[in-house]
Amino acid sequence: MVVEQKEQEPIVKMRDRNVNAAAHSALARGIEALNEGEVTEETEEIRKLDTQLDHLNDYMSKMEERLKAHNDRMMETLKQQKEEREKRRRSFHERMSQNQSEDEEFKKQMSSILKRVQSVKRTEK
């Protein structure tokens, strides 16, 4: 009995059989780039861009420091303003209490005077 060997299909089919070819070409480009010893225009451009990125990072660091210092000053100003408002509020309430007590004292004095006047009027009748 001769058994024909059928080409076995893989259980999982690849959607695109050119995946290996794409991987090989990517590897070839990578190896070619590694083997290049000379500086090309592209690598020079990459170095320039890298330098620009370094300058940008330095600038951003300085800006962050300035913003932090500005934020600290703003927070200190807000704290001082809050303390001043609290002092004014306390002072206002103290004056209100003092005015109320003075008003009460005045009312008592007026009441006392009125009582004396009324008592004098009664005695005169």
Curated annotation (Swiss-Prot):
GO cellular component, one term: cytoskeleton
Region (Disordered): 79-125
Coiled-coil segments on the chain, per record: 46-95
Protein localization: Cell junction; Cytoplasm, Cytoskeleton
Single annotated GO MF: molecular adaptor activity
GO BP: any one term: intermediate filament bundle assembly
Predominant cellular place of this UniProt entry's protein: other
Tissues where the protein occurs: Expressed in many epithelial tissues, including the pharynx, intestine, excretory canal and hypodermis.
Domain of life: Eukaryota
Phenotype upon gene inactivation: Mutants are viable but developmentally delayed. They have bubble-shaped invaginations of the apical membrane into the cytoplasm of intestinal cells and abnormal aggregations of the subapical intermediate filament (IF) network.
Keywords: Cell junction, Coiled coil, Cytoplasm, Cytoskeleton
Role of this protein: Dynamic component of the endotube in intestinal cells, interacts with intermediate filament and regulates intestinal lumen morphology.
Name of the protein: Bublin coiled-coil protein
Species whose genome carries this gene: Caenorhabditis elegans
